[in-house]
Amino acid sequence: SGLQFAVMDGQGFLPFPRV
């Protein structure tokens, strides 16, 4: 989701920037 820290996203926890 383009975030730079671990956050609850649609795919789950994403501890890295995602686009």
Curated annotation (Swiss-Prot):
GO terms for cellular component: extracellular region. It comes from Lobatophasma redelinghuysense. The keyword Secreted applies. The modification Valine amide is found at residue 19. Signal peptide: none annotated. Mediates visceral muscle contractile activity (myotropic activity). Belongs to the periviscerokinin family. This is CAPA-Periviscerokinin-2. Keywords: Amidation, Neuropeptide, Secreted. It is found in: Secreted. GO terms for biological process: neuropeptide signaling pathway.
